[in-house]
Each structure stands twice: as C-alpha cells, then as structure tokens.
C-alpha cells in the first residue's frame, strides 16, 4: 500500500498500483489473499475502485502510476465480484458496480490496449469480437466471464434488470463456438469468425514479402509467423484447446456444448493425455478440476497430483512457468491444502490434499482446519467427509463455511468412492 506516496492524488483510500497483471492473479492469487488476509484484499479492491474514480478506468495491469496493457478481459471485475460474493466488508460496491459498468459500456478509445474493453463496439453489436481485432477469441470469452461477474454484483445489490441483462450477455462465448469443427477426437471449438458471421478456416496474420500471409487456423494454433506480435493473436498465450475449456462461470453450459457428460469426459482425457493442457500458464488453471462437474472429483485429484509430481519441485526452477505475481505458486498452495477457488463465485472445490493438515487462523480469532485420516500415496481417494462433525456429501465448500471456523475431515482410502457426486446446490436447490 503506497498511500501517501502517490503523486497523482491524495486521499484516505489505499493505493496499490503494481498489478502485473490482474489477468494472471484473479484466478488464484486474489482468492488466496481473500482467504488468508481478507483485510489486505479489501484494501486492494478499494484501491482498484479508487483508481477508477480518480483515473477513469480500473486497471488490468498498472505500474508507475499508470494503467498498462490489457491481456484479456477487464478482469478487475472478477476481483470485485469475488470479494462481493465472499462478503468482504468495507468496500463501496455501488461505486464498484459503476466501475464495472464503465468497462462494459464505454469504449476506451485509443487507450483500448491499456484499459477498458478493446473491441467493445463489436462485442456489443455482434455478441462476439471478430477476427482482425487483437485477441478476439479470448477477449470474447473473458468479457463473457466478466459480464457474469457484473451480473453477480448487480443481483446482490438488488438491480434485477442489470442482473438479467448481463447474465444473458455472459453467454456470448457461445457465439464463437463452432459446433461442427472436429480435432483430435473432440468436436466443437471456439474459433475465428469475421464481422459478417463467417467461420474462418484460413486467416491472415499480416503482410510479408518473405512468408505466405495466409495460414490455416486450427485448435492448436498458438503462435503466428515471426513478424506477428504475440499480443495480436486470436488467443492470448493459449490455444483454442485451452480456451474452449475455459468457461469458469458456466461449466454446465460448456458440457452441453461439448455433447454431454460422456463426451466431455473423453474430451478432458484427450486434453491431458495428448499434451494440449499447458501447465505453465493461467488459462488452463481450472481445467484439472472440471471432472468435479462430471460427478468424479477423484479424477480431478488424480490429474492434479500427476501435474504437480511432473512439474513442481523444491529446486531453483521449482515452478513450471512464470510465477506471475504469485499466480502459479497460489495454484500449488491451494491444491496442497485440498481446495481450489472458482474466481468470482463463493465456493472452493475439494480435492485430495498433499498436506495431512492445514489450519487457517482467521481474522475473527477462529480457526478452520482441514484434516485427513489415513492419507498416503496409496490412500489417495476421499471416502467420506465431515464438516463440524456432520456428514458432508458435497465436493465443494462455501467461503462462509470456512470463515465461520470449524473442521473439515477427509477420510481417505485406496479406491475411488461415491463421495462428492454432487458439487453444491445453489439458492434454488439446483446443481451448480
């Protein structure tokens, strides 16, 4: 917190300005801070909102008192929604919603690479961003996710019309979903589309006197030719294989687009077994946990432990990629404890931990303990769970159930069990 050192304005609000970048940190770093130091996360969120108030837009990246490059969506919206649904107090969420709505409605002009939503006019008119605008693919996907974040805050503040509008808009990722495209045994991918709605099998990266300027685009296309900046790709730092599985706010909708549970499970297996999963970057962070939505949380745990064993160690190069302001190490920390957040929502997925016991010492003076019984390399499957002495059948736990204190006990065994077939129930007693 650099309050008092800010040369641009003086007030009593916290001032954090080293965000590098929220695209990296919103998935794991921010949720971990919320869990272990909620006062700090409250100040960070207040700072984001105050930057909007004083400087015009919340940042995606910021350093040296200036908003920097946007990478995907206007991801500060997810940070605000995450704080809101987890009940962090002392934040002006009405003003926060104003900041979110400015991102979602006001074009940032020639600052579109530094703040706000680039390609916003097309997104609002077409429901997607057409190829030719940098990062059209992941911007469409992430704006949809950010719209869900807006809907969540609007609903909590009693703004029903806004809630319905942005909930509907959060489905815009489907407008780039090409149902008939097949690759490596999977069908349906997020792929380039032009302004007229045509799907593009061939794309132009730019003009060159050396190389052919038109290339076939496939779900494994990751980089362009040498003369193309990496930030001008259809997806930012990822492939369609990765982003077509990165719909954290609507996993049931994703499963439906993939052809149902059986085909989705087969697709996940192809994703991991064929090497399309990228351990060293953020777009795939949630993917190992997607088996939870198939009533098979034990398969999520198997994937997670395999990934950690192959890619993490305690040597000088112990992380598989850039830590990105704690994003990579926070992913590991959560999985060592047996929890994993779905940012912008109020729950954590439960997996087999690597640690026999974890104790959270909460701000309210209480503690929350995660304990295991019989955990070993052989006994790696959860057989049953109790929360504060009561049978707990769900494979996720709400934030409020952690911060009120208590104990989650995981009984382990050698074989997969029937535990955890239900993720959680929402307010309408429907499956998440």
Name every feature range the model reports, one short phrase each.
Residues 13, 27-30, 63-67, 82, ...:
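Short alpha-helical segments and helix-capping/turn motifs at coil-helix boundaries
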Residues 26-29, 41-51, 64-72, 83-86, ...:
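Mobile, glycine-rich extracellular loop/lid and propeptide segments
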């Amino acid at each position: 917190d650099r309050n008092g050192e800010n040369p641009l304005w003086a007030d009593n609000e916290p001032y954090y300005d080293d965000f590098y970048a929220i695209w990296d940190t919103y998935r794991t770093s921010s949720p971990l801070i919320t869990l272990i130091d909620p006062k700090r996360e409250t100040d960070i969120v207040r700072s984001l909102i105050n930057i909007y108030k004083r400087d015009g837009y919340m940042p995606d990246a910021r350093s040296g008192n200036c908003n920097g490059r946007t990478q995907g969506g206007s991801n500060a919206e997810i940070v605000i929604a995450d704080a809101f649904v987890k009940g962090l107090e002392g934040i002006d969420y009405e003003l926060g919603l104003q900041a979110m709505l400015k991102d979602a409605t006001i074009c940032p002009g020639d600052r579109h690479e530094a703040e706000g939503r680039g390609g916003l006019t097309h997104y609002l008119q077409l429901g997607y961003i057409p190829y030719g605008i940098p990062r059209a693919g992941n911007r469409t996907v992430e704006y949809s996710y950010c719209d869900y974040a807006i809907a969540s805050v609007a609903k909590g503040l009693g703004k029903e019309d806004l809630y319905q509008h942005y909930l509907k808009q959060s489905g815009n990722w489907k407008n780039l979903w090409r149902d008939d495209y097949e690759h490596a045994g999977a069908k349906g991918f997020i792929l380039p589309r032009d302004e007229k709605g045509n799907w593009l099998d061939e794309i132009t990266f730019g003009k060159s006197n050396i190389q052919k300027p038109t290339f076939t685009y496939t779900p494994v296309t990751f980089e362009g030719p040498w003369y193309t900046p990496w930030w001008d790709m259809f997806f930012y730092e990822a492939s369609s294989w990765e982003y077509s599985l990165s719909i954290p706010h609507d996993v049931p909708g994703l499963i439906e687009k993939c052809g149902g549970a059986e085909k989705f499970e087969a697709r996940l297996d192809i994703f991991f077994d064929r090497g399309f999963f990228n351990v060293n970057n953020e777009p795939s962070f949630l993917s190992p946990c997607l088996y939870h939505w198939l009533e098979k949380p034990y398969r999520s745990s198997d994937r997670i432990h395999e990934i950690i064993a192959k890619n993490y160690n305690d040597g000088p190069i112990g992380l598989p990629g850039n830590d990105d302001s704690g994003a990579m190490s926070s992913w590991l920390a959560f999985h060592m404890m047996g929890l994993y957040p779905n940012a912008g929502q109020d729950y954590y997925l439960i997996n087999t931990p690597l640690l026999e016991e974890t104790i959270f010492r909460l701000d309210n003076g209480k503690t929350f303990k995660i304990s295991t019984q019989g955990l070993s390399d052989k006994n790696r499957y959860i057989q049953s769970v109790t929360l504060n002495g009561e049978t707990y059948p769900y494979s996720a736990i709400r934030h409020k159930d952690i911060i009120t204190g208590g104990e989650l006990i995981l009984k382990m065994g050698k074989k997969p069990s029937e535990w955890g077939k239900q993720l959680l129930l929402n307010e309408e007693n429907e499956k998440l």
